[in-house]
């Protein structure tokens, strides 16, 4: 018959055994599968401990039944084996040789990095010089682990007391699922530890209208963005065209105040023309988006950690973490509310122009002028010659305020 054994560590083991098999022989099989010595195994069936000499059939174990294996503490054996090892631990969780333990952990930069991320208090103590405090923290961590382990064992024991209970089955399923998540996390720590590190975004040094700035390079943003305060500091706010108001969509959304059609930017030693979408975003100064990356043939070279411009005529390095203002790094650490902050907008940013004018009464005469006069009629005639009806041509020209090229593109696009 087939039985399933679940360990206290939530490992699932399936065994094919005879119904007349003794519990001791089952434990021998489990020792091979789990590496837990027979002496430390404690098998439970329906919440009751199984004796080594008992047979499975005598205990009522049937095909597809579930057993639970607990592991008893072998503190004396652990203490003996740890005595010859300076890096060993005492039964209370403290280090046998705290100085050697501290030195060993300090020498592993990857482990220290994980500690600073997962247990900053312990990492700070290891970095310090107070060995007594280190021992106290290690004992506290050991007590916490012991309490959690005991709670888990008690909960599992209650679950397996009635394994056919629906709620118990649901909790067992959740425990198995969590075990898979934990194993995936442990595998990532071993094989992909950089996945837990904070990624430093791409910044380069630029000058906008003669003002030095740290530009955030984001190929996921449709347009190049400048904040209202930054545009004012660069002397460009007076050039903002408010007819280009709209909504910026990304992770969240924010209002587009207008557009600055062209201004000089300096990358390396060269000057380039650049247009900007202006946002009222205090958390983001200047974002170099996909429109200008394409226009100036920029290449993001992550192997060399540089951005090349103009097909390679200029190459500027991406800034190291120490060169990036701390306020930008803080924004990366703490996610902002998408509805109130432009910091969540840039990556994946697209702009949606708002054709609704703020003051219809004052703007209406301008719209009427676009549909009057010989110039407008000449545009209609050109587009009608392309095969479009006069009514659709007039509607398209009015939609784009007399812009013949945009109207033609709209008509051809259906």
Curated annotation (Swiss-Prot):
Catalytic residues of the enzyme: 218
EC numbers for this chain: 3.4.23.-
Domain Ubiquitin-like: 1-76
Keyword vocabulary terms for this entry: Aspartyl protease, Cytoplasm, Hydrolase, Protease, Ubl conjugation pathway
GO molecular function annotation: aspartic-type endopeptidase activity; polyubiquitin modification-dependent protein binding
Subcellular location: Cytoplasm, Cytosol
Residue ranges constituting the Peptidase A2 domain according to the UniProt record: 213-292
Start and end residues of each UBA domain: 374-414
Claim: Protease is one of the keywords in the record: yes
Extent of Polar residues compositional bias: 355-372
GO biological process entries: proteolysis
GO cellular component, one term: cytosol
Domain of life: Eukaryota
Matches recorded under InterPro entries: DDI1_N (IPR033882), Peptidase_A2_cat (IPR001995), Peptidase_aspartic_DDI1-type (IPR019103), Peptidase_aspartic_dom_sf (IPR021109), UBA (IPR015940), UBA-like_sf (IPR009060), Ubiquitin-like_dom (IPR000626), Ubiquitin-like_domsf (IPR029071)
Region ranges (Disordered): 332-374
Primary location recorded for the protein, binned into one broad class: cytoplasm
UniProt keyword annotation of DNA damage present: no
PROSITE patterns (alphabetical): ASP_PROT_RETROV (PS50175), UBA (PS50030), UBIQUITIN_2 (PS50053)
Protein family per UniProt: Belongs to the DDI1 family.
Subunit structure: Homodimer.
Described purpose of this protein according to its UniProt entry: Receptor of ubiquitinated protein targeted to ubiquitin/proteasome-mediated proteolysis (UPP). Relatively weak affinity for both 'Lys-48'- and 'Lys-63'-linked ubiquitin chains with a slight preference for 'Lys-48-'linked chains of three or more ubiquitin units.
PANTHER family reported in the protein's UniProt record: ASPARTYL PROTEASE DDI-RELATED (PTHR12917), AT13091P (PTHR12917:SF1)
Protein name per the record: Protein DNA-DAMAGE INDUCIBLE 1
Organism: Arabidopsis thaliana
């Amino acid at each position: 018959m087939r039985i399933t054994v679940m360990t206290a560590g939530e490992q699932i083991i399936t065994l094919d055994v005879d119904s007349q098999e003794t519990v001791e022989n089952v434990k021998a099989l489990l020792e091979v599968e789990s590496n837990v010595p027979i002496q430390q195994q404690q098998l439970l069936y329906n919440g009751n401990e199984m004796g080594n000499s008992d047979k499975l059939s005598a205990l009522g174990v049937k095909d597809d039944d579930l057993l639970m294996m607990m592991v008893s503490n072998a503190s004396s054996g652990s203490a003996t084996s740890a005595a010859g090892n300076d890096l060993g631990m005492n039964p209370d969780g403290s280090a046998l040789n705290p100085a050697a333990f501290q030195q060993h952990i300090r020498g592993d930069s990857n482990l220290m990095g994980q500690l600073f991320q997962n247990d900053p208090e312990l990492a700070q103590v290891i970095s310090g010089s107070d060995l007594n405090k280190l021992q106290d923290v290690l004992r506290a961590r050991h007590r916490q682990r012991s309490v959690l382990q005991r709670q888990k064992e008690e909960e599992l024991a209650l679950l397996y007391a009635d394994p056919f209970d629906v709620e118990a089955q649901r909790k067992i399923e959740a425990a198995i699922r969590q075990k898979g998540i934990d194993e995936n996390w442990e595998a990532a720590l071993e094989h992909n530890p950089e996945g837990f590190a904070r990624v430093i975004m791409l910044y380069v040094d630029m000058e906008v209208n003669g003002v030095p700035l740290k530009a955030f390079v984001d190929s996921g943003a449709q347009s190049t963005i400048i904040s209202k305060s930054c545009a004012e500091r660069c002397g460009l706010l007076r050039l903002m065209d408010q007819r280009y108001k709209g909504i910026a969509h990304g992770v969240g959304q924010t209002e587009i105040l207008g557009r600055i059609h062209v201004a000089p930017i300096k990358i390396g030693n060269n000057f380039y023309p650049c247009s900007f979408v202006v946002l009222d975003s205090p958390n983001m100064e200047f974002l170099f988006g996909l429109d200008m990356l394409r226009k100036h043939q920029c290449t993001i070279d992550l192997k060399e950690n540089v951005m090349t411009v103009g097909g390679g005529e200029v190459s500027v390095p991406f800034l190291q973490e120490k060169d990036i203002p701390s306020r930008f790094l803080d924004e990366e650490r703490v996610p902002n509310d998408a509805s109130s902050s432009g910091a969540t907008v840039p990556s994946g940013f697209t702009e949606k122009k708002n054709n609704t004018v703020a003051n219809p009464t004052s703007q209406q005469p301008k719209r009427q002028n676009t549909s009057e006069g010989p110039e407008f009629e000449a545009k209609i005639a050109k587009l009608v010659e392309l095969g479009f009806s006069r009514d659709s041509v007039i509607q398209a020209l009015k939609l784009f305020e007399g812009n013949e090229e945009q109207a033609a593109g709209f008509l051809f696009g259906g």
